[in-house]
């Protein structure tokens, strides 16, 4: 993956084509479903995805909201959010 393809704070993130965010009521779990694969999300991954993919602003704005919501240092939130989003992009679950 080239450095130019990395998701940064200026990016606008969306679920990749064919990927759906679904809740399994029986198991009480949220997951990303894609053709022939799925990824179960923990609470933090779900919060990040909701903040970044449902927002009208960029990833930086989502980081600001998450840092305020969780009363955490912005730098730590930014590092975690960008690492997660780039991992999900590498696996084909999100795009920018």
Label each PLM-derived region with a short phrase.
Residues 1-50:
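Acidic, low-complexity/disordered tracts enriched in E/D and polar residues
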Residues 37-96:
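Long, charge-rich, low-complexity alpha-helical segments
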